[in-house]
Regions:
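Hydrophobic/small residue at the entry helix of a nucleotide-binding pocket
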Residues: 33-34
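Conserved acidic residues
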Residues: 98-100
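Short amphipathic alpha-helix with an adjacent loop that forms part of the alpha/beta core around
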Residues: 104-114
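Conserved S-adenosyl-L-methionine
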Residues: 42-48, 136
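Glycine-rich phosphate-binding loop and adjoining beta1-alpha1-beta2 segment
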Residues: 46, 51-89
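N-terminal charged helix/coil linker that caps or initiates catalytic domains
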Residues: 1-26
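E1/E1-like adenylate-forming module used to activate ubiquitin-like modifiers
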Residues: 116-117, 121-202
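Conserved N-terminal Rossmann-fold NAD(P)-binding element of oxidoreductases
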Residues: 27-29, 52
Length: 202
């Protein structure tokens, strides 16, 4: 009998789909990057999520965030994302953490229970803490670099942090990884130069 994951099973096989169903992924930051990550994972059949974000949907998020609509403005991002996941897969297990992840509260999270960690937060200190905690727990992690004011999707690449260029955030992360003796880190970054920022919306 066909279900919402039949095409995924046809593409990757039943064994792979079973692994996805058992997978537990933590996504830190449910915004322009993290929201699309969670959506794709849910549609792929990942069965268990931890969602971490303290923000609410703002009207200015509508141009780029998958959870943002006029109906969701003002609602907690993690709650909106939970509803979207369940509308795709009612059997998904979801734990919400309506908080900002900081080095000060990292001990509240048990990274060892995750199969994969996605860092989609903006704060450098938080990004570093997420990566270090995942590495310490032996859990695979991918970190998103700067995407603000960039419009060319063809310029995005998946690479090791030490092979990145142009991106200022990646430069800061490279320095931090060297300082903490982290030899490799998978990241998504763009070689595109950012567009000029608009100082004020009118």
């Amino acid at each position: 009998m066909l279900n919402q994951f039949s095409r995924t099973e046809l593409l990757f096989g039943s064994e792979a789909l079973a692994k996805l169903k058992k997978a537990h992924v933590a996504v830190f930051g449910i915004g322009g990057v993290g929201g699309h990550v969670v959506e794709a994972l849910a549609r792929s059949g990942v069965g268990s999520f931890d969602l971490i974000d303290n923000d609410t949907v703002a009207i200015t998020n509508i141009n780029r965030q998958i959870i943002a609509t006029l109906d969701t403005v003002g609602q907690p991002k993690v709650e909106v994302m939970r509803k979207r996941i369940l509308s795709i897969n009612p059997e998904a297990e979801i734990t919400l953490h309506q908080c900002f992840f900081l080095p000060e509260n990292k001990d509240e999270f048990d990274f060892s229970k995750y199969d994969y960690v996605v860092d989609a937060v903006d704060t450098v200190a938080a990004k570093i803490a997420i990566v270090l905690a995942a590495k310490e727990a032996g859990v695979p992690v991918i970190s998103s670099m700067g995407a603000g004011n960039k419009v060319n999707p063809a310029m995005f690449e998946v690479a090791d942090i030490y092979k990145t260029s142009i991106d200022p955030l990646a430069r800061v992360m490279r320095q931090a990884m060297k300082k903490h003796h982290i030899k490799k880190l998978k990241v998504v970054y763009s070689k595109e130069l950012p567009l000029l920022q608009v100082d004020e919306l009118k």
